[in-house]
């Protein structure tokens, strides 16, 4: 009875305290929309010693901005107040900074959860309420945190299936050979819990792809974990919270381990005797389970030689070739607690050479969407062909009922023969790497059997399926889109259906090519070519949350760097990336136009997100690489290096190299000029005054040398250009053209496009990125529209009309060929679509206040476009611009996030006609401080504006 009275009193007290807190809520127009740590919501496995806090505020009214913030961090929720916060109390900090605010509290401990919240004040000193409590959990901060966890690998390869082998044949081999690769490994162990668990965290580092099981169920929705890396220098672990999934008493843990890129020891060998083994070693895994009990005690359970191991039904797996699954060798319910594993062996401890293990911070690869057959028909050999209607990256899943031992083989391909009668063999991936894209399933013969792969993904639209007794349908076979789960955060739509379709194809081509790295293609190579990566980076940033993705890829580039001799001074050594990162297929040192990705990716991350940490972190490497490229300077002041404007129309490096109109040295030096300016900015940010001055001088010298060497008159005209469309576009984009020559150069570009090329582009990836933006900037927007929408080769509309659903690598006249050549899914050709946001939408981040703290609004569009709607993600919230154009008037609805301002670009005539929210600019300026003038441009504070002016 006394206990009940005490409990009732405590409940009353709790209700009273809660009511008091509710009464203390402020009436405020400042509301938190998002509260993030390291750009994530409630993240686990944080390894930063000084995490970064950010928040997005929704606020009513106009011209609202932050004047101060207050952050609390505590070790528990009950300490998360101003009096008891025991980890960090920032107190009130006078600052407008609301993104990437650096933690300055006590040292954070490994594998520990912390709680935090924030409040802000606006410039009128209006105070917000505290945000809802958030948490973050630290990861394993150094090797000692792994405790006794050992690396384990398969002891015995016991595969006996005759289907463990595949054919491998490169172009240098007369006959194929049989290969099998490393076996997929199955590991299990049990743990008995006799106390109540308060928190349970599992940390798994797979060298090779893995899947994790607990008590008969797969844990999480990740596939193909973890992301690829330079495994000898950097590997990634994944953290799982399994507190709610553990049972009292016995629990069974299971791991299936595949080769991934770590154990890929087949593809990219020149011949059977080649020593180009791209594997790092046999796949291996490390597991640590950290348990905290409700009585306050802790314990660990980890991988070691006591774990049991076996092979199983996955009898072959290769990231390029595919999986082979022999269902006759299934292991039963091997992840359950009551499974008899007495026939299994014991795992072998191993010690792979790895310098660093970190938490995987990028989004995981997941199964994103299923696709049903759109058409099913028989090929010329009588086998069934399935068309899924969309070129995707992923795999197929099967649901079949056939006799025991029946082999079902699925060959995936991007294209049919031009006559449509069969799949095109040249589009199955094997021509490049020696392994055709094939999935194999061998039936156990006991009724309906369902299966999908685990350790490979392909690029395909079509599938030829052999070995089935009935016509395939949606119940039998589906395609599964599998990719890194980058979140789509931006949007674009306009009045032109062709542009909308181009935008969708560009997005598709990117999504298909993110699997822990920005790939060149999802089938033939699966490589992170640096030139491809920077070609489509900005368009990706307009559409997706790529913050962590590109930070991870920068680490891939850094860990891929090799000591390289200087060109002019071979006695000097520089750390230089290779053309490809990460992995053992490196190509050569990164030529200038590819290697500038090392500077561009941090620049874009800074420009679009405003986080200067990546600039500071990679500054030494960027500085060293800049000096390496300066060591190519010739007597004429031009760097004698370059890869070239990849894949212009009709170009083939072996049979038609002349089709590359732009000299590789010219396009490389144009990029390098831009990068010298970026490095000047980076030097200033890093208080490196000497290098800042050096970069300024080198940039000015290169501009002079570039114009002297490459700016020429076009015969029989009054115009000039830089000897190709690409170089001319680059020179205009990067500000290399002398002021007095701009009009002549623009006219020269137009002349070549219209009079010489018949209204077509002749650009590869370097020129494609900027040509439509540049034409729009210099008053030739209608010409940009013409190039894009003409139905004739080589326009984007021609490609779409040819039936492609992603952008092909090469620009050829497809109807004249037996079948499409090379890859049909290359995101380097998506880069031009940044034009839809920066020109049509008119939204660009300011270089003066990065991360869209200030941004430019300046729609530049062709007369054929009458309406455009864009949403651009920023660290402050979404910028939205919805405009329509009719009878010379531009009507715009513009939404500007809290704590930012927009620079509306106008000429004097446009300014004089300007009406904002129904008022002339002059009247509005008298009554509000949220609108100011800067030349003829108008600076707008936050809020939603209705804008109308005569567009000239």
UniProtKB/Swiss-Prot annotation:
The active site is at residues 525, 809. Induction: By ulvan and rhamnose. It is found in: Cell membrane. It is an enzyme of class 3 (hydrolase). It comes from the Bacteria. InterPro entries: 6-hairpin_glycosidase_sf, 6hp_glycosidase-like_sf, Alpha_rhamnosid, Bac_rhamnosid6H, Bac_rhamnosid_C, Bac_rhamnosid_N, Ig-like_fold, Rhamnosid_concanavalin. It is a lipid-anchor. Its EC number is 3.2.1.40. Residues 1-21 form the signal peptide. Belongs to the glycosyl hydrolase 78 family. This is Alpha-L-rhamnosidase. The lineage of its organism: Bacteria, Pseudomonadati, Bacteroidota, Flavobacteriia, Flavobacteriales.
């Amino acid at each position: 009875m006394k206990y009940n009275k005490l409990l009732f009193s405590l409940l009353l007290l709790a209700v009273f305290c809660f009511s008091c807190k509710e009464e203390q809520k402020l009436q405020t127009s400042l509301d938190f929309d998002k509260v993030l740590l390291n750009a994530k919501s409630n993240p686990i496995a944080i390894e930063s010693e000084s995490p970064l806090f950010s928040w997005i505020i929704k606020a009513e009214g106009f011209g609202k901005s932050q004047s101060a913030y207050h952050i609390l961090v505590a070790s528990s929720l009950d300490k998360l107040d101003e009096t008891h916060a025991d980890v960090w109390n920032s107190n009130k900090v006078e600052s407008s900074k609301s993104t990437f605010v650096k933690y300055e509290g006590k040292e954070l401990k490994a594998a520990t959860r912390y709680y935090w919240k924030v409040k802000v004040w606006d410039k009128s000193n209006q105070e917000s309420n505290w945000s809802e409590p958030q948490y973050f959990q630290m990861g394993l901060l150094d090797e000692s945190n792994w405790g006794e966890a050992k690396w384990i690998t398969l002891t015995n390869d016991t595969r006996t299936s005759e289907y463990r082998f595949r054919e491998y044949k490169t172009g240098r081999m007369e006959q194929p050979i049989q290969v099998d690769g490393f076996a997929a490994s199955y590991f299990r162990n049990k743990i008995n819990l006799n106390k109540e668990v308060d928190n349970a965290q599992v940390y798994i580092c797979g060298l090779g792809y893995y899947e994790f099981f607990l008590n008969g169920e797969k844990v999480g929705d990740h596939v193909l974990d973890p992301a690829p890396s330079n495994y000898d220098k950097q590997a990634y672990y994944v953290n799982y919270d399994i507190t709610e999934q553990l049972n009292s008493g016995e629990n069974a843990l299971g791991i299936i381990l595949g080769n991934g890129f770590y154990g890929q020891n087949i593809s990219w060998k020149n011949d059977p005797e080649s020593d180009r083994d791209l594997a790092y070693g046999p796949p291996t895994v490390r597991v640590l389970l950290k348990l905290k009990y409700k009585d306050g005690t802790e314990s660990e359970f980890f991988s070691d030689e006591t774990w049991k191991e076996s092979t199983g039904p996955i009898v072959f797996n290769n990231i390029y070739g595919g999986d082979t699954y022999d269902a006759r060798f299934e292991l039963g319910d091997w992840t359950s607690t009551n499974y008899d594993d007495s026939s299994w062996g014991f795992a072998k401890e191993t010690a792979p050479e790895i310098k660093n293990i970190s938490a995987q911070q990028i989004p995981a690869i997941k199964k994103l969407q299923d696709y049903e057959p759109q058409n099913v028909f028989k090929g010329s050999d009588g086998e069934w062909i399935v068309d899924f209607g969309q070129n995707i990256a992923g795999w197929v899943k099967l649901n079949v009922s056939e006799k025991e031992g029946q082999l079902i083989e699925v060959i995936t391909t991007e294209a049919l023969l031009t006559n449509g009668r069969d799949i095109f063999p040249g589009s199955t991936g094997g021509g490049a790497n020696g392994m055709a894209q094939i999935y194999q399933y061998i039936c156990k013969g006991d009724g309906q059997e369902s299966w999908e792969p685990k350790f490979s993904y392909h690029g395909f639209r079509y599938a030829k399926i052999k070995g089935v007794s009935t016509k395939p349908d949606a119940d039998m076979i589906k395609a599964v889109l599998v990719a890194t789960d980058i979140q789509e955060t931006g949007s674009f739509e306009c009045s032109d259906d062709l542009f909308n379709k181009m935008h969708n194809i560009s997005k598709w081509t990117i999504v298909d090519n993110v699997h822990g790295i920005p790939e060149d293609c999802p089938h033939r190579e699966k490589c992170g070519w640096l030139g491809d990566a920077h070609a489509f980076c900005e368009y990706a940033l307009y559409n997706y949350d790529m913050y962590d993705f590109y930070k991870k890829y920068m680490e891939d580039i850094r860990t891929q760097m090799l000591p390289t001799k200087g060109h002019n001074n071979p006695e000097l050594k520089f750390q230089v990336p290779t053309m490809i990162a990460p992995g053992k297929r490196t190509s050569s040192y990164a030529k200038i136009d590819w290697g500038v990705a090392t500077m561009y990716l941090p620049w874009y991350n800074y420009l679009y997100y405003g986080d200067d940490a990546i600039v500071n972190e990679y500054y030494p490497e960027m500085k060293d690489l800049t000096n390496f490229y300066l060591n190519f300077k010739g007597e004429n002041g031009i760097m004698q290096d370059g890869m070239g404007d990849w894949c212009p129309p009709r170009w083939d490096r072996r049979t038609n190299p002349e089709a590359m109109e732009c000299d590789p040295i010219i396009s490389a030096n144009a990029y390098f000029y831009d990068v010298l300016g970026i490095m000047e900015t980076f030097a200033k940010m890093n208080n490196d005054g000497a290098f800042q001055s050096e970069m300024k001088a080198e940039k000015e010298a290169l501009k002079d040398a570039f114009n002297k060497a490459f700016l020429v008159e076009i015969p029989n005209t009054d115009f000039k250009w830089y000897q190709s469309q690409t170089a001319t576009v680059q020179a205009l984009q990067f500000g290399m053209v002398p002021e007095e020559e701009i009009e002549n150069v623009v006219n020269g570009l137009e002349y070549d496009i219209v009079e010489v090329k018949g209204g077509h582009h002749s650009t590869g990836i370097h020129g494609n990125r900027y040509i439509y933006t540049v034409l729009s900037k210099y008053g030739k927007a209608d010409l940009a529209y013409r190039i894009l929408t003409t139905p004739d080769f080589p326009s984007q509309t021609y490609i779409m009309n040819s039936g492609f659903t992603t952008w092909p690598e090469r620009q050829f006249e497809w109807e004249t060929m037996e079948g499409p050549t090379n890859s049909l899914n290359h995101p380097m050709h998506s880069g031009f679509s940044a034009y839809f946001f920066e020109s049509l939408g008119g939204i660009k981040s300011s270089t003066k206040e990065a991360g869209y703290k200030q941004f430019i609004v300046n729609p530049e569009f062709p007369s054929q476009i009458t309406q455009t709607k864009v949403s651009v993600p920023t660290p402050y919230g979404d910028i939205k611009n919805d405009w329509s154009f009719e009878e010379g008037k531009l009507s715009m609805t513009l939404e500007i996030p809290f704590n930012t301002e927009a620079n509306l670009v106008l000429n004097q005539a446009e300014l004089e006609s300007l009406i904002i929210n129904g008022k002339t600019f002059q009247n509005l300026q008298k009554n509000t401080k949220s609108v100011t003038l800067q030349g003829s441009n108008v600076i707008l504070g936050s809020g939603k504006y209705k804008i109308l002016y005569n567009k000239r």
